Amino acid sequence: CGMTAVINTGNDPNWTGHDLAAANLYGYGRLAFETALSPETIAAEWIRLTLGEDPLVRENVMTILMMSWPTYEKYTAPLAIGWMVAPYNHFDPSVDGYEYDRWGTYHRISHSAIGRDRSSRGTGYSQQYFEPLALMYDRIDTCPEEMLLFFHRVRFDHVLSTGETLLQHIYNTHFEGVEDVERMLALWQALEGRVDEAVYERVLGRMRFQLTHAKEWRDCINTYMHRVTEVPDEQGRKIYD
């Protein structure tokens, strides 16, 4: 057996463009030798080796790194629905970007439901897994919610384990995603003067851009869902019509 990965290195002096993204590359190398390491252990090592021993730096950067993945998931495509990106860059939001070409059929959104049925009652994709995974993914009530819309077509009024409807979950997570980026930005700004100035400014610029981009994703996704379903956000937050 072996390991392989897709790594976004480039011509930047720090290789990864975003200084904090180097933690992923470090983690890949560490897992190649010790496969049982936890994300927290890897992150703690990388922070200490890269940014030093300052307790506030270690605490804040650890929080940022542990938040980054779930935060991105919150404000982009919900519950494993698939690509909702612009075809020209795979980065900006575009709900129907790939929906109507030969690579499409990711979300099949209607006024009442969303998702592609890949269960045994649909395309049968779930049956490519060995048991017990095949049965687990095949049923809505046992499929992990983080994978729900990849394997199933689900009504917007379906109630999740949180007690939210599916549609309200989409609204909530996209607002929460922006709030999480704001929190990460504040955590980094608290480190001014505690890390190398050039590193601080590069990461600050990236995080400010991420906040702008998260707001764009939030507004595009929530507006699309609202227009299709005509169901308002229960909390009355701003959704553009």
Can you say where each PLM-predicted feature lies in the sequence?
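Catalytic domains of carbohydrate-active enzymes that cleave complex glycans
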Residues: 1-241
